[in-house]
Amino acid sequence: MKLLQLQYFCTACKYNNITRASEELHISQPSISNAIKELEAEFGVILFKRLKKGFTLTREGETLLRHAQELLQHAERITKIMTDRGPENNSIRIGIQIGRAHV
């Protein structure tokens, strides 16, 4: 399980739609679908029922969503705490994934 997979899953759940999630994250729909399929394979569960338009979360999907949101919030706090304490706290670091870069 990777934080990026959880981020993709949470964003898809936010919109109840993979297409809208891919637009927000500026990545392809297959990237999000693959990340979610990897999570399903890793945990051996189905996270949502796919519908013609969007999806509905299964019980397992609801559980993962709740815990994934908490985990992502903790990861964000850890990053902030550690970067604020570092010796380079007066500098700005910018990181961009290649798939998210827009020119």
Residue ranges and their predicted role:
Residues 10-28:
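Short helix-boundary/capping micro-motifs
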Residues 84-100:
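Interdomain hinge and pocket-entrance segments immediately C-terminal to HTH DNA-binding domains
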Residues 9, 40-57, 79:
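A short LG(V/I)-centered, amphipathic sequence patch enriched
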Residues 42-43, 64-86:
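Alpha-helical linker/hinge and terminal dimerization helices associated
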Residues 15, 24, 37-46:
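Residue cluster at the C-terminal edge of the helix-turn-helix DNA-binding motif
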Residues 2-5, 29, 54, 61, ...:
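The N-cap/first-turn positions of alpha helices
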